[in-house]
Amino acid sequence: MKRECHLQWYNYIPVIILYSAVIAITFGSLFSLFTNTEMYFIIRLFLFIIYIISLGFTLHYHYKCMTISNIIDYGDDNTLIVTEEKDKNFCKICKVNRPKRSHHCKVCGVCNLRMDHHCPWIANCIGEKNEREFIYFLLFCAITCFFVCCLNFNNFFAFLKNRGLLQEINYRDFIKAMTICSFIISLVVGLTTILIGAHYLLYNVKYNITSIEMFIYKNFSECPDYENDLKNNLLRKIRPFPFSFIENYFREADNINEELNYKNFSEENIKLLNEENNMIKL
């Protein structure tokens, strides 16, 4: 049986605010492209093109995070409809025995597979199926904000240098104010994204735990013994890569490692067999 989340209209207000900020930043960056005379136009054009490309990736992964569902349906494997509590994985609201590491979201009103947290900026829960998209969303969001700050850097410091910028309100001053707002918003959003992303990658990915589990277990020594390898956990979560040539490179590396492991395994077996044969002869 298909289940749906029960979000209200006000749950989408943060998403509307986010897209409004994107529109304001884009207009401010566009104004800065033609008004920032202290930077060469070719450099401004390059920064603006990179900004548009990274913004496209950011919006793409934001849309993926919003639309990919982690909801546990009644027909999922290891999910059973029951009328009484049987174990700790039982959800009293949904009346189902959930798969391990699943949790009920009070905002969505449903249980989610390996739920990490509910993100108001995407109006959806981050879980098993959209965790990869969330990591790439944070990455490209930070890259986008970085290039916006570079594009509007000179206008912002021109404002600090000339305090009388907005004393006479005219069209040119409005344009400069837009670029300054773009710089400030991008700086705040970028730093926030970097801090959240760094915390998420260093702790959640390294210890292979969710944000909910991090709050449940007050220190990492109490966490279940999941695989605690940052490189392997990170590669497992972000693959397949968004660019095919990067994915092909890692696939070739995986094949080489598998061949080496097989070769080493075979050599060890040969040594053991030779030792056993020598023991038998003796």
Predicted stretch roles:
Residues 1-282:
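Membrane-associated feature with strongest affinity for ZDHHC
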